Amino acid sequence: HENHSPVGAFKIRGGLTFFDALRQQGALPRAVISATRGNHGQSVAWAARSHGVRCTIVVPHGNSVEKNAAMRALGAELVEHGDDFQASREHALALAGQTGALMVPSFDLRLVRGVATCWWEFLRAVPQLDVAYVPIGLGSGICGAIAARRALNHPVRIVGVVSSHATSY
């Protein structure tokens, strides 16, 4: 179960594959930065700490107290900025430019590769699955599902879903 991973979500697979790819290329940065509301930040913080890399996570004001505490507990420096994810993201990009930290977007291909492993396992375990309804969010989950489906030549129909109340970017 993904909820039994160290961060309680599939996102950790993305963070670990992202940092492993950098390590294999001899390109581990001194510091990374990202914007998130939670699980992506936990993934990046966990993987950064595992690789001895400083991590800053930018979250919007009013973000989940529990998610913020979890990211801090994993070693991330937390910066609260803006009223929504987009404002946090823009601030993270500006900080990356000022500090030289590597920006880690949640939809980076190296992250999606890790997320796809979850779908790879699931689709292999359920070959008769007809349809999977997948939250779109910022894209790593649904892109991982599609990548795994294509790699396995699985017939499942992937349907992206989003709340009618979700902010659009």
Spell out what each predicted region is.
Residues 1-169:
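PLP-dependent amino-acid enzyme catalytic core
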